[in-house]
Amino acid sequence: MITPAAYVGAAIAEIAGCFAFWAWLRLGKSVWWLVPGMASLALFAYLLTLVDSEAAGRAYAAYGGIYIMASLGWLWSVEGIEPDRWDLAGALICLIGAVVILIGPHEI
């Protein structure tokens, strides 16, 4: 099944793309950071089309939990800030919701 890989890839691409804008506007990096950033955001959008879902909104809703987990991973691994218990508790709640959306018996 391609859905888990598509969600993880989309999360990495979205976070990297958004971070390029953050780096430019908040960290004073060159405007050229936007070139790979925009390519990364385009890859993010493409990867979400690979998700096994009949409805875009449902795919995006389920993706939200994955995005939150990936964002906390970025926080820790790239920015060097360890997520606290509130970060982790909130992420767990969202991830449970994403799993319910993914595996629930939906009507088409």
Curated annotation (Swiss-Prot):
Q: Where are the transmembrane segments?
A: 5-25, 31-51, 61-81, 88-108
Recorded topology in the membrane: Multi-pass membrane protein
Q: Which Pfam families match?
A: UPF0060
Keyword rRNA-binding set for record: no
The UniProt record lists the keyword Aminoacyl-tRNA synthetase: no
Where does it primarily localize? membrane
Q: Which GO terms describe its cellular component?
A: plasma membrane
Q: Which InterPro entries match?
A: UPF0060 (IPR003844)
Q: Which UniProt keywords apply?
A: Cell inner membrane, Cell membrane, Membrane, Transmembrane, Transmembrane helix
Could you tell me where this protein is found in the cell? Answer: Cell inner membrane
The text of the family note is: Belongs to the UPF0060 family.
UniProt protein name: UPF0060 membrane protein Nwi_1459
